[in-house]
Design a protein with these regions (language model features):
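Beta-lactam-recognizing serine transpeptidase/beta-lactamase-like catalytic domain environment
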Residues: 71, 193-204, 251-308, 312-544, ...
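Periplasmic/cell-envelope proteins involved in peptidoglycan metabolism and beta-lactam response
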Residues: 1-278, 302, 377-389, 497-500, ...
Length: 570
């Protein structure tokens, strides 16, 4: 009996001890939660009763060289609902469906969805948002937002680019300068009770957004409009596939004009141009067409430059001393290179001519001879030294690189064709940049649009700087090249670019596209003025013109007209 009582007493003590330990553990846990972790759980409790809504920042403007706004903001609204606060769901559904022009079932699903906040529609016109706000519907929020707006429509569309639904840059300058333009979003914090209803007495906590900075660019609206009209005119007259025009300062790299027609409407960038047939196309095929429409051929696409590239061969030959302006050549209408007969554009030949006359006549055999005198290794040396194997660094996304033979794969035939601008490909911006360095005394500048960054209120700003590489060629060679190219315009194949009272230099080009048997051409002209001290360099490239296709006949007059427009504005 005594043993049994002792056994029960032990069991009681064990139960008591276990309970005491459990109680002690609970007390310890409570102390830990209320003391050590109190801040953490206070924050969690706050989060349960706080609702956050983002306030988008006003995106920075993009302005042209004279301060005219090219990309601006338009006030729009975002319509949202808070399920727990809606008192009359059917009324909310009916009004939102009506005012937003949305399907009733779509709105119903969003309104009846149990979530802290549900977005109904974004980018709603402010006038519509004001009407909805006027209904004073419980649980319906109307927040003002921003949508990108482009006052000039399609002007410089492939340069400026556009933003998506979230107002972030997608292509062009909009994406290149995203970090500068986007600003910093703000937020609104509201406190709710356990049912999720906002507590009016506590109001709301607001953190204001910070507007993005403004970007000033070198592009000139007047010149861009003039050049775009000139490009459209020649595209229509020659029934060409597309036309590109580039105008820049060869001394500092500022780009004044960058036209690529057909352009597209920046305010409706996801709609293909009217002349594009989309019947029978699936969504991926339509997207591919959009991607093609958005491309900027001046820097995203490469082409065979043809005879405009003779400027590079000329400069390399003069710098290396393998040719002089007084050297004489004979052109029978072709040049034999190894076992290949390479023809001149003039099949009957130019006969005896000086190097300068060879440039005026755009004679292929003359430049083949200069290339052969240089040799593969030396020609490749200058090709690389002039910067043709690297990208220009232009401040737009997606710049394509040069497509060139590897030096070890180049023979005399490849060298001969490269010397007059065929069998390899570069971008128009690369050609313009390289020729600029050969005309300005040997400084390889960086082509660019961005000039300065300005604060949103215009009270402060900073100038953008770009790298410059010196010693590309000597000043003496540069001066000689300028003189030869002035003769090309005043007395040679570029005579259609002559301007009374102003010295113009330049080079024509007419190159066949692949396959050669298709008889399709790229006609172009590169010009600069004044010839003795170039301040403007321009290129016009016409793809697949019909009828007369010579660059000196159809592209040179376009640059002439644009140069005259520049002179009128000086």
């Amino acid at each position: 009996m005594k043993k049994t009582m002792t056994f029960h007493r032990k069991k009681i003590w064990m139960v008591f001890l276990v309970c005491a330990l459990m109680l002690l553990g609970l007390v310890g846990r409570l102390v830990y939660l209320m003391g050590v972790r109190s801040d953490y759980y206070y924050q969690k409790a706050e989060e349960l009763h706080e609702r956050e809504r983002a306030i988008k920042a006003a995106r920075g403007q993009i302005m042209d060289a004279k301060g005219r706004v090219l990309a601006d903001n338009k006030t729009v609204c975002t319509i949202s609902v808070i399920h727990s606060q809606i008192k009359k769901p059917q009324k909310v559904i009916e009004i939102l469906s009506k005012e937003l022009g949305m399907d009733t079932d779509t709105v119903r699903k969003k309104v009846e969805k149990i979530s802290s906040i549900e977005r109904i529609k974004t980018n709603v016109e402010k006038s519509v948002g004001d009407v909805i706000r006027g209904y004073e519907l419980d649980g319906v929020k109307v927040d003002e937002d921003y949508k990108r707006y482009y006052p000039y429509g399609s002007l410089a569309s492939k340069v400026l680019g556009f933003t998506g639904g979230d107002n972030q840059g997608i292509i062009g300058l909009e994406v290149k300068y995203e970090e500068i333009l986007k600003g910093q979003a703000g937020k609104i914090l509201t406190t709710t009770d356990a049912r999720g209803v906002e507590i009016d007495q506590l109001g709301e906590s607001r953190e204001d957004p910070v507007a993005g900075e403004n970007l000033k660019i070198s592009l000139d609206v007047d010149l861009q409009q003039y050049a775009q009209q000139a490009a459209l005119k020649v595209m229509e007259e020659k029934q060409a596939a597309r036309v590109s025009i580039l105008l820049m300062n060869p001394q500092n790299g500022e780009i004044y004009v960058c036209v690529n027609v057909p352009e597209f409407d920046l305010n409706d960038p996801f709609t293909l141009n009217a002349d594009v047939d989309t019947s029978g196309l699936n969504e991926q095929e339509k997207q591919d067409l959009l991607n093609q429409m958005w491309r900027n051929p001046c820097l995203n696409d490469t082409y065979e430059p043809g005879s405009t590239f003779k400027i590079i061969t000329m400069s390399a030959g003069l710098e290396a001393g393998v040719v002089s302006v007084n050297d004489r050549f004979f052109c029978p209408g072709y040049k034999l290179v190894d076992d290949r007969r390479i023809h001149c554009a003039r099949r009957t030949g130019h006969g005896s001519q000086s190097f300068v006359e060879g440039a005026q006549n755009s004679c292929n055999p003359v430049f083949i001879e200069v290339g052969l005198r240089l040799g593969v290794e030396n020609y490749y040396h200058y090709f690389k030294k002039f910067g043709l194997l690297k990208k220009t660094g232009v401040d737009l996304p997606g710049e394509a690189g040069t497509i060139m033979h590897k030096m070890e794969n180049m023979g005399n035939v490849e060298l001969a064709t490269v010397a007059f601008g065929q069998s390899f490909q570069i971008t128009p911006i690369q050609l313009a940049t390289t020729v600029s360095s050969l005309l300005n005394g040997g400084r390889r500048i960086t082509p660019h649009f961005g000039v300065s960054i300005l604060s949103s209120d215009g009270t402060s700003g900073r100038k953008l700087e770009y790298p410059v590489e010196t010693g590309i060629i000597s000043e003496k060679t540069s001066e000689t090249v300028r003189g030869i190219l002035e003769k090309v315009v005043s007395e040679g194949s570029g005579r259609n670019a002559r301007i009374e009272g102003c010295t113009v230099g330049g080079k024509t080009a007419t190159s066949q596209t692949l396959p050669r048997s298709a008889n399709r051409y790229i006609s172009s002209f590169l010009g600069f003025m004044p010839a003795e001290d170039p301040q403007i360099l321009g290129i016009c490239i016409i793809h697949d013109p019909q009828g007369v296709y010579y660059g000196g006949t159809i592209a040179a007059p376009v640059i002439k007209n644009i140069f005259e427009a520049v002179l009128e504005r000086v």
